[in-house]
Each structure stands twice: as structure tokens, then as C-alpha cells.
């Protein structure tokens, strides 16, 4: 810790201790931009995977879907689930997110990019990406996979 000097009547006094490396506070805009960029990355991957160019972010395509907490718009039904993306350090609250989603006719898949602080808490990097899906939906995917074999 460094100390801030002040002069009072030719006498040096130490007022307070200041941290050498103050933590940088990230703004809400930073988090929003990070999340938007992650949505676009997932859209690009899904377009390549399905060959469907109509997949887009719900922000760009449907305010109604966006308000229902669904991040990826799929008007052609090329994806068997709704998608919510998260790029956070903390584990997403799956129960809360499922309760907030406005549509229930397809299962919800939460695609989570785990963020991790590194090197003095100033840099944040990805520590893996995971898809969180309901168990019943996982069993449907497994059955479909085995039926094709």
C-alpha cells in the first residue's frame, strides 16, 4: 500500500493508505456488449451447423421474443429448443431463468460461457462453454442419436 502525503505546518503527515493496484470496476455497458457479442458468436455457429441463414439474435429480429428472455430467434424451427446465452463468472440461476422464459412449447437450452478472472483481477477470460438442458430433453437427444445408428 502506498500512503498519500499531506503537508500541514511543515510537518509531513500520512492521511490514508491507497491501494497500489485499485480494482477496475466494469460498467453495465461492458457486460451488455460482452453478452451481445457472445449472442452473435452463437448465432454464427448455429447458422454454420444447421445451414439455416434465418437464425438471428432475437434483439435483431423479434422484440417479443427478446422480452420473453429468448436470445436466439429461429423462425424456421431448425433448432429443437429455445436458447438463452450467458457469459458470466457466476453459475446461471437455471430455475429462475426457466421461470422467466415466456414460451414453454420447446425446452430451454442455456449456453453458458464461464468467465474467470486472471492476473490480478484485471483480465477476464473464458474457462469453457457448456449447454445446460433439461434431463428429459437430453434423453430425447440420446434416443434420437441411438435411433440413427
Pin down the residues of each PLM region:
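Conserved beta-strand segments of the P-loop GTPase G domain that flank and frequently precede/overlap
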Residues: 84-85, 110-113
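Glycine- and charge-rich intrinsically disordered segments
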Residues: 1-23
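Short glycine-/polar-rich loops that comprise or flank the Walker A/P-loop
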Residues: 105-108
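Domain-level recognition of nuclease-like catalytic cores that cleave nucleotide substrates
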Residues: 2-4, 113-149
Amino acid at each position: 500500500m502506498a500512503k498519500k502525503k499531506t503537508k500541514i505546518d511543515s510537518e509531513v503527515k500520512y492521511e490514508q493508505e491507497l491501494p497500489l493496484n485499485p480494482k477496475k470496476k466494469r460498467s453495465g455497458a461492458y457486460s451488455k456488449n460482452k453478452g451481445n457479442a457472445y449472442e452473435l458468436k452463437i448465432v454464427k455457429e448455429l447458422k454454420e451447423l444447421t445451414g439455416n441463414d434465418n437464425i438471428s439474435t432475437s434483439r435483431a429480429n423479434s422484440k417479443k421474443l427478446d422480452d420473453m428472455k429468448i436470445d436466439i430467434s429461429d423462425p424456421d424451427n431448425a433448432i429443437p429448443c429455445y436458447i438463452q446465452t450467458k457469459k458470466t463468472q457466476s453459475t446461471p440461476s437455471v430455475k429462475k431463468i426457466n421461470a422467466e422464459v415466456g414460451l414453454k412449447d420447446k425446452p430451454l437450452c442455456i449456453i453458458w460461457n464461464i468467465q474467470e478472472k486472471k492476473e490480478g483481477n484485471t483480465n477476464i477470460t473464458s474457462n469453457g462453454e457448456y449447454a445446460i438442458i433439461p434431463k428429459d430433453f437430453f434423453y430425447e437427444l440420446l434416443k434420437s442419436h441411438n435411433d440413427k445408428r
